[in-house]
Amino acid sequence: MFDEKDLIIDARHITRRFPAAGGKELTACNDINLQLYRGKTLGLVGESGCGKSTFMRFLVSLDKPTEGEILFNGKDITKLKGEELRLHRQHIQMVFQDPTNSFNPKMKIRDIICEPLLNFKKIRPSEKDAVARKYLEMVDLPGDFADRYPHNMSGGQRQRVAIARAIVLDPEVIIMDEATSALDVSVQKNIIELILKLQKEKNIAIGFICHDIGLVRSVAHQIAVMYLGNIVELMPAEDLPQKAGHPYTQALMKSVFDINMDFSKKIESIEGEVPSPLDVPPGCPFQNRCEYCREKCKTDRPLLKEIYPGHKVACHFCQQIGEMEK
């Protein structure tokens, strides 16, 4: 779907298991294969607890998978240690959901933005003020905000500072973990526009984690839908909503609120509860919530298969379901 020469991150067969009480294991990510490309956004969407943040933490080397490899420009970053790992971190940056908790409240905005540059000895301390003002203006904030503290700013302004800090090292990849979910809708729109502008200017690859599939559709070039640690659908963003093939993806789309929607139509929710990750049933992980579940779904785990160019679905009966939906 994308030019292979633009491939920057190739995550192969990523699995993460955590030990649990009673000798059990919790599988947070199960055999995940995803790629990030320069200048493109991969949206990773799913309900809370599905494993999307766990997966993205591997890309920024905050955790290591139990199995699998993550190739960054062809090099497996899961094997990096010490100084080699420290130097690698400048190439992949992260914007967290709550910038307040990722800032030192005693540091001025000038110091917050320039700390990464000082860590890698890319500027002198005397240059901090000019650099901070430059990057504040780059994220559409006044340069004199450099003298402020985080508590003197609104949530949207703090998130812009977080983005400025993320881009100050000119990274090739930025991971955004629910970076807009705590913001008002109007502020959210401005932040999204800023992200897209910076991506176009700097050709950055973005991993965008979100639980709102409607928002992801407006931001991403490619969308991966995750459920209970599994990728159940991987598709070009333009395939939503008409070509959504997995029942879970369809259910997520039906629950999206739209101001232009028919208000006589009920906003649907997904019936049932997510199974315990300590006791995942055999077969399809979505079986107990799927209205189309059949016997095969309870015994055989569906694998991702291509139904359209660049569009893969992990469902035994997605094509039949598509005909029924029509």
Model-derived features with residue positions:
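Helix-to-loop junction immediately C-terminal to a conserved catalytic motif
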Residues: 60
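P-loop NTP-binding/switch modules centered on Walker-like glycine-rich loops
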Residues: 179, 183, 187-265
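Conserved ABC transporter NBD signature motif
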Residues: 68-76
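A short, proline-enriched helix->beta-strand linker immediately N-terminal to the Walker B motif
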Residues: 168-172
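Charged, flexible cofactor/metal-binding loops and thiol motifs
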Residues: 2, 25, 236-326
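Conserved ABC ATPase "signature" region
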Residues: 76, 126-144, 250-254
